[in-house]
Amino acid sequence: MNRTGGLLWHWRAWQRQAEWKGACDGISQWLDQVQPASQELLIIGASAGWMVPVRWLQGFEKITTFDIDRWAAPLFRWRHGRLLQASKTQLLCHTGDALTPLDAVLRANPKAAVLFDNILGQLRFQQPSLAQAAAQIEKITRSMRTREWGSVHDAYSGPVSPGKSASRAAYGHQSVQPAYLSAFETDHGAVSLAPEFTEFSAQFKAQGVWLDHLTSNVFPRGTPVHHIAWPYAPRYSHWLQAGWVAL
């Protein structure tokens, strides 16, 4: 299965809506606190909008989506198109890469706030090396310095005890992005770890080696960061981070 999309991914998302409800509720609660200044929204990595509440999207006058997955645009319209039409929200869906030509995409949408929808944590799977993935993430965040933007993304993921990841009582916590994070050891050496991981891993009984998605320092210092548990599969969980950067 393609980690970043594909028909099997959408089938899994549709099939596991009940199990993912806690994570979706956590994202909704985060977005309820976000009050974008812009009336336009650019969603990069939109997929079918499985975890973004349509009521929040209805607050915009125009929404533009990008995703490399050819199924994303038609399924996004299928899931959200009717209600967005009811709120008179203009919807434009594009199939293609918006990250490589990010500066050009931003210039084409000068008034839009930007939401990276569960894509930054996937870049480690799309680059030949971890160093190249980390460099791409850093380049993306530099491009956003003059733009209102937010992201929900994988921070870490890994195996959990049977039955723990299926709980709807998803772990939720809010913190502030520090200047730096303390180091710990994973399968590829010293990386950064937020202190909230200790509480998260205890609640979900994390097991084995967890994967670092290279996103620990995505947000500028002082950004409120929401930590959300995502029970991706019965024995595998993701720790999501969500934050919004205002101008």
Question: In which residue ranges do the predicted regions lie?
Answer:
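Class I SAM-dependent methyltransferase Rossmann-like catalytic core
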Residues: 1-38
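Conserved class I S-adenosyl-L-methionine
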Residues: 37-49
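Conserved SAM-binding loop of SAM-dependent methyltransferases across substrates and taxa
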Residues: 47-60
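Conserved SAM/SAH-binding beta-strand->alpha-helix loop
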Residues: 69
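S-adenosyl-L-methionine
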Residues: 79-108
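A short glycine-rich, Lys/Arg-flanked "PGG" loop and its adjoining helix->strand segment in the class I
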Residues: 106-108, 128-149
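A short SAM/SAH-binding and catalytic strip from SAM-dependent methyltransferases
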Residues: 111-130
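Charged, low-complexity C-terminal accessory regions
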Residues: 158-247
